[in-house]
From Swiss-Prot:
Keywords: Isomerase, Magnesium, Metal-binding, Phosphoprotein. It comes from Pyrococcus abyssi (strain GE5 / Orsay). The modification Phosphoserine is found at S96. The gene is glmM. GO terms for biological process: carbohydrate metabolic process. CDD domains: PGM_like1 (cd03087). Pfam families: PGM_PMM_I, PGM_PMM_II, PGM_PMM_III, PGM_PMM_IV. Catalyzes the conversion of glucosamine-6-phosphate to glucosamine-1-phosphate. Binds 1 Mg(2+) ion per subunit. It comes from the Archaea. The lineage of its organism: Archaea, Methanobacteriati, Methanobacteriota, Thermococci, Thermococcales. This is Probable phosphoglucosamine mutase. Activated by phosphorylation. The active site is at S96. InterPro entries: A-D-PHexomutase_a/b/a-I, A-D-PHexomutase_a/b/a-I/II/III, A-D-PHexomutase_a/b/a-II, A-D-PHexomutase_a/b/a-III, A-D-PHexomutase_C, A-D-PHexomutase_C_sf, A-D-PHexomutase_CS, Alpha-D-phosphohexomutase_SF. It is an enzyme of class 5 (isomerase).
Length: 451
């Protein structure tokens, strides 16, 4: 990670590390880097988003860059608008699934792909040196407002076709997806019920769509006998799914199902995922004639590998999916529509999920200050061989150790002050035993790093 940018742009607590002053410098740095051109900018529903957006816009205009402000917008709408308006870059003001006190700044290139670490380091260099381009009075950038929502919905409807109508419950989590996702599904011919769809910055539920945070969605689907529940995080770059039985569909299962559907739809090819994805994806994709490629965590890494390998689909086991035939921006709204197309062609999720191999996946977050992460990872690397016997090690992002029937990933979060442990085993007992050892190892490593 750089000084400002992590695995998903800048993401910090507002008015502590992420201030209007820093946002202004990011705008100036991006404008200096682009040296002219046009930038699309949008924001999520957080109370601080307008403040930060205006600061970024000021920096861009001051450096001579024209800005198209599309207002309240989910991340995928920004990615779509970059191409629609032939922009040179895009900026999203969002902290995605982080708590409401956080916000962030994420930059996208002209192809809708997140800025690579190399480009982010260049922006950091410009910020640190403060050698900003400042346009003369008669060359200051122009600011325009636009609303590409209708064009976005129309474009999705050209890609997604349903032969039948479904009852869909949508939970956008009071985020930016509230302004599009329900309307899209109505246009697709579905009966739509919404919960948590008021787009305010005081979120009713935890923004990360998981089994616990989507308990109300699950109850609603079951009570209404709906066909499916669709959920998003704060900026709708993710999708979470509840099946027709009111059961949350684990991310590993959904990742396998949608990867399989993309292989059926577009033909055999490579599926790109991250080091925290489990064995089920490999087994399922291999059975359909596909191949899995792994990379570091983060949508930009997935997008890079998709371009490198000409992959048919890229996804993380967090509900973050990239459909390269559509865009290189992770798009939870398009993904939700794609899930409906899949059940329209193949059957309801609860039945489809039975085809996916089931292993036990456990995840744990352990608090760790950002400035201790590097030292803690050094200590973890020393302790792992003493505590575990394993056959393979992968170090492209954190440390992943593997045997044929289990794996563990130790990784510092790029967006929060935590260490993440993700593991998978064939049985619950084995998984819990491994997690107990792994958790103790990480806590010991953090303790050593802090002494």
């Amino acid at each position: 990670m750089g000084k400002y940018f992590g695995t998903s742009g800048i993401r910090e607590v507002v008015n502590e590390k992420l201030t209007p002053e820093l946002a202004l410098k990011v705008g100036l740095a991006l404008g200096t880097y682009l040296n002219g051109g046009r930038v699309v900018i949008g924001n999520d529903t957080r109370t601080s988003s307008e403040m930060l957006k205006k600061a970024v816009i000021s920096g861009l205009l001051a450096s001579g860059v024209d800005v198209i402000d599309i207002g309240l917008a989910p991340t995928p709408l920004v990615g779509f608008a970059i191409k629609l308006y032939d922009a040179d870059a895009g900026v999203t003001i969002t902290a995605s699934h982080n708590p409401p006190e956080y916000n962030g700044i994420k930059v996208w290139d002209r192809n809708g792909m997140a800025y690579t670490p190399e480009k982010e380091r260049e922006l950091e260099r410009i910020i640190e040196e403060e050698k900003f381009k400042r346009a003369p009075w008669n060359e200051i950038g122009q600011l325009k407002q636009a609303n590409p929502r209708e064009e976005y919905i129309e474009a999705i409807m050209k890609e997604i076709k349903l032969d039948n109508s479904y009852t869909v419950v949508i939970d956008p989590g009071n985020g930016a997806g509230s302004i599009i996702s329900p309307y899209l599904h109505r246009e697709l011919g579905n009966r739509v019920i919404t919960i948590n769809s008021d787009p305010h910055g005081f979120f009713v539920r935890e923004l990360e769509p998981n089994k616990e945070s989507l308990s109300m969605l699950a109850k609603t689907v079951k009570a209404l006998k709906a066909d499916i529940g669709i959920a998003h995080d704060g900026d709708a770059d993710r999708v979470g799914v509840v099946d027709e039985n009111g059961e949350f569909v684990e991310y590993e299962v959904m990742l396998s199902l949608i990867a399989g559907y993309m292989l059926r739809k577009y033909g055999k090819g490579k599926v790109v995922t991250t080091v925290d994805a489990g064995f089920a994806l490999d087994d399922y994709v291999r059975g359909l004639g596909g191949e899995v490629v792994r990379t570091r965590v983060g949508d930009v890494a997935v997008a890079e590998e998709l371009m490198k390998h000409g992959g048919v689909f890229g996804g993380e086991p967090s509900g973050t999916w990239i459909m390269p035939q559509w865009n290189l921006t992770p798009d939870g709204i398009f993904a939700g529509a794609l899930v409906l197309e899949m059940i329209d062609r193949l059957g309801l999720i609860g039945e489809l999920a039975k085809e996916v191999p089931r292993y036990v996946t456990l995840r744990k977050k352990i608090p760790c200050p950002n400035d201790l992460k590097a030292k803690a990872m050094e200590e973890i690397a020393k302790l792992i061989p003493r505590e575990f016997s394993y056959e393979r090690e992968i170090t492209i992002d954190g440390i992943r150790i593997e045997n044929d029937d289990w794996w563990i990933l130790f990784r510092p979060s790029g967006t929060e002050p935590i260490m993440r442990i993700t593991l998978e085993a064939h049985t619950k007992e084995r998984a819990e035993s491994l997690m107990e050892k792994a958790e103790k190892l990480v806590k010991d490593a953090i303790k050593k790093a802090s002494s």
